[in-house]
Structures are given as C-alpha cells and as structure tokens.
Amino acid sequence: MLEKLQNSRNALGLIFMLPAAVLLLLFLTYPLGLGVWLGFTDAKVGRPGEWIGFENYAYLITDSVTQLALFNTLFYTTIASALKFFLGLWLALLLNKNLRFKTFFRAVILLPYIVPTALSAIAFWWLFDSQFSIISWVLVKMGVIDTYIDFLGSPWNARFSVIAANVWRGVPFVAITLLAGLQTISPSYYEASAIDGATPWQQFRHVTLPLLTPIIAVVMTFSVLFTFTDFQLIYVITRGGPLNATHLMATLSFQRAISGGALGEGAAISIAMVPFLLAAIMFSYFGLQRRAWQQGGADK
C-alpha cells in the first residue's frame, strides 16, 4: 500500500494537501458558512437570533448609510487600484533598466508594503492631523497656504487622504510583481523590434504590454480584492468618518456587528460584498483566457 502511494504522484500529492485542506475548512469555510447563516437571522451579541429570511438584505438596500458605504467602496477601489497600477507599472519599468544601485532601490521600494498596516495607518493619521500635520506645516512655511489643511475633517478631503494612504502602501506590491514579469521578457524581442525601427513607445505597446498582460490581470485582481476589502487603514485613520464619508463595506460591517451588536446585519453586509469580489475574479479569469486564445494557447 505504501509503495503504491509512493509510486502514485496524484495520491501522494493529495495526502500532502490534506492537512492544508483541513485547516482551510476549519478557518475559512466554517466562518464563511456561519456568516451566510447569520445574514439570514436577527442575531445580536449574546443572543442566537431567529431566521428572518432576506429582511436584513431588504433593509440594507434602502439604508442610506449602506448605500453611501457601497459608493465609497467602489470609488475607493477604482481610484486607488488605478493609481497603484499606473505608478507600479512606471516604477517597474524604471527599475527594469540598468540603473546604478537598482538592487538597493528594489529593496527600499518594498518598505511601505512590509511595514505593519496599523503602524503605517497611525503615521498617516499623524500626517493628516488638522493641528500637527507635517504636510500642512511645510506648505505654510513655504508660503503656499495660510492655514492648516483639514485633511480628515471634510468628506472629500478624507476620501482622497485615505486613498493616498492605500496607494502608498499598495504600490510596492504592484511594482515588484510587474517587475518580475518584465524580467521574463526576452531581450531578443526588443532587439528585433529596434532593428525594425520601433520607437520606445511602440516597443512598450506591441511587445511589453501584450506579454505582460497575464501578469497585469493577476496583479490587478489581487489589488482590487485587497483594496475592496480594506479595513485596517480606514479604521485606524478615520473610523469611517467624517459623516460616514470614508466608511467602506468592511468597516460598516464591523461597526454594525461588533460595535452595534447587530451580528445578522453586519454579516449581511459582509456577504453582500461577495458578488463584487466574484465579478473581479471572473473578469481576471476571462481576461487571461482571452489573452491565451489570442496568443495561440488552448481556449479553455
């Protein structure tokens, strides 16, 4: 029996995967299933609750705060993901060149990503403070402004402030991953295109971008997922304020379920995020399949 398992790669692989699969079932599947169940109940903290069907979801559709949180989440995800992509791609192209000390710069660029989220959020909270902001202090000393900017006191200032914090933290992940993709592109493609008279822009458009598209699809999928479900940055910097202007679906779910004690309502908000996350995953999947088909791969 043991010899058969050793000779069967599939069976041996399944055995090695079993411990991880059990852990995933315990720590991922069970909480997800419990969350789905709670979303259909009126459970409160300390009280199991009863089955109420879709009442929580019907209430959320008409709830103005939930509607605002959905808008904030989509706006936050769209702007932050786009900025992270363009800045990350620019940094990746820059670091892919033969620069002096490029190894050092590649290491430095990872610092925002490896710093604990709560620590970086506290730093940004200090940077955006209405009284002690170093940004406002510098601008006042330079004569650009007369009074300190209230970064977190008005809705739109707060929205763009937390977007800036998310971009600062997320750009390294995009840049390093795209840089790894650029390293896989053979220099012979660029040499051949240069012989044909291609300009740097034409090389980027017709060589770099098509070959990098699968990596871009994967990176942006993870970027969108991480941004859409962001919690720590928002909770530490603004806690959803001012006037719920920076509440995301994740922070609102926490506020309703933990702070407010409405476990069923909070769970319903969390489950309502799932269709948007699935849409992002499916968009990436079909994008990869389309690119594989265009490049002559198997159309699955």
Predicted feature residues:
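A structural signal for multi-pass alpha-helical bundles of membrane permease subunits
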Residues: R9-K300
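Short, Lys/Arg-rich, polar N-terminal cytosolic tail immediately upstream
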Residues: M1-S8
